[in-house]
């Protein structure tokens, strides 16, 4: 058991190590020379770590922006945080071991299902699997399951989600990437496909966000990072002005608050640059290495990777998705109390990563107009679903808490429906 716990806590929860081991296995199965195996494995890990470093820079900048945004406009409500649910389930309920073992079980079930079903997707986003494991264990626990039955049920449900969600998104993914080499491993798939549906109904895919014609004086905006900067700097400065110097001083210290927020906007752009460099390095090594697994262990399988791998395909759509998902989430924030549900505060980080990815999906099937309309709808959607789950979590002891990723929310709904059908309620 100690060995298993060590593997789970130190390997399976370290996404860079998992991805590196997958690359190692793939290269070994292809009988590549030792130098190629070492190089490919290390570059895969390095690519993932560079991606993660960029993501961390973005998250740090957005955390400041999000806190000051709420203070600037006096917003109060629930903050959706699956991290909080994970922490309480381990400290108050003592479910840490069950969550860890279920995480390993989900990965095993995913591989088995990929082997025996037509859905050949290996889910490689370790952090997302941890959150799915948390929700599966928590809701299985409150359905009355304990010990081994809890772990088995949680593993099967989580493994099914890890297999089916990439399959659900793959028709649009093929259009976005122009190939069938990679899949999406991010538990916001219901939101992405909902956005794509709205975009397809309301948009025109022939007018892409990436084909905007600019006058010569604005041609510099064709540089992805400069165009992001032009959008984000005003966002940050407006929030700084409304929040005021006192609120900003907590983060800015002795630096002028306007200058500080200007630099934070540039920090965001820097993080995006690093993230995209990591994506390119990761895909250049992982996709060829994964062919070994595809050929030997799970024939025709595809790696399901985290959402930032899509950002280079439509960078303008990422920014539009972020902006209009944020607008939609603000609308949703005021709409939920009108529906008798708790008010959920918009999460800036989820708006960027999930909203940006939703923008790519929307643009692919609905162009610019579809991206705008679809992402506003997406913002409302990702406010309403967590608000619906919050009372259910309250019933089982998680007061004033809810989740962010909509697929984990759907997992909660699934368990509660099964509980009702079984008559345990």
Language-model-detected regions and their locations in the chain:
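Mid-membrane cores of alpha-helical transmembrane segments in multi-pass membrane proteins
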Residues: 73-83, 101-107, 127-135, 154-159, ...
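Short, amphipathic, aromatic/basic-enriched membrane-interface segments that mark the entry/exit
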Residues: 7-11, 91-98, 117-126, 311-319, ...
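Signature of multi-pass transmembrane helix bundles
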Residues: 1-54, 97-105, 109-288, 297-306, ...
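Helix-loop-helix junctions within the multi-pass membrane cores of secondary transporters/permeases
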Residues: 20-22, 38, 70-88, 194, ...
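Membrane-interfacial helix-loop connectors
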Residues: 127-143, 286, 325-387
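Membrane helical hairpin/interfacial module
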Residues: 47-100
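Transmembrane alpha-helix/helix-exit interface in multi-pass inner-membrane proteins
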Residues: 60, 64-72, 277-293
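C-terminal TM-helix exit segments that contain a strictly Trp-centered aromatic cap at the helix terminus
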Residues: 55-63, 385-394
């Amino acid at each position: 058991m100690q060995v298993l716990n060590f593997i789970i806590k130190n390997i399976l929860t370290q996404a860079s190590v998992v991805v590196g081991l997958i690359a190692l296995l793939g290269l070994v199965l292809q009988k590549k020379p030792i130098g190629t195996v070492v190089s490919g494995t290390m570059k895969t890990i390095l690519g993932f770590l560079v991606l993660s470093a960029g993501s961390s820079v973005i998250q740090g900048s957005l955390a400041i922006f999000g806190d000051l945004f709420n203070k600037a406009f006096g917003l109060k409500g629930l903050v959706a945080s699956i991290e909080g649910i994970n922490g309480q389930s381990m400290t108050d309920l003592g479910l840490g071991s069950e969550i860890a073992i279920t995480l390993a079980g989900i990965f095993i079930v995913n591989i088995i299902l990929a082997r025996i079903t037509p859905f050949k997707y290996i889910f490689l986003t370790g952090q997302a699997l941890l959150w799915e494991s948390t929700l599966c264990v928590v809701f299985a626990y409150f359905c009355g399951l304990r010990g081994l039955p809890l772990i088995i049920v949680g593993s099967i449900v989580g493994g099914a989600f890890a297999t089916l969600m990439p399959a659900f998104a793959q028709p649009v993914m093929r259009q976005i990437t122009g190939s069938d080499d990679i899949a999406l491993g991010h538990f916001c798939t219901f939101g992405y496909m909902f956005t794509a549906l709205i975009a397809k109904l309301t948009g025109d895919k022939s007018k892409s966000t990436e084909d905007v014609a600019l006058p010569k004086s604005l041609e510099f905006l064709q540089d992805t990072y400069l165009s992001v900067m032009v959008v984000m700097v005003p966002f940050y400065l407006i929030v700084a002005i409304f929040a005021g110097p006192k609120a900003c001083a907590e983060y800015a210290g002795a630096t002028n608050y306007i200058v500080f927020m200007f630099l934070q906007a540039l920090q965001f752009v820097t993080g995006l640059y690093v993230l995209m460099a990591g994506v390119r390095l990761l895909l250049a090594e992982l996709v060829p290495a994964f062919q070994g697994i595809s050929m030997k262990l799970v024939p025709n399988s595809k790696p399901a990777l985290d959402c930032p791998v899509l950002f280079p395909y439509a960078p303008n759509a990422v920014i539009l998705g972020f902006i209009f998902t944020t607008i939609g989430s603000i609308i949703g924030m005021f709409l939920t109390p009108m529906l008798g549900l708790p008010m959920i505060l918009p999460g800036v980080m989820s708006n960027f990563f999930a909203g940006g990815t939703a923008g790519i999906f929307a643009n692919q099937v609905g162009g610019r107009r579809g991206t705008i309309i679809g992402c506003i709808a997406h913002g409302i959607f990702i406010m309403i679903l967590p608000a619906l789950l919050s009372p259910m979590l309250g019933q089982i002891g998680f007061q004033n808490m809810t989740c962010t990723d909509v697929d984990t929310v759907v997992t909660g709904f699934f368990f509660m429906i099964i509980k009702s059908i079984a008559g345990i309620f």
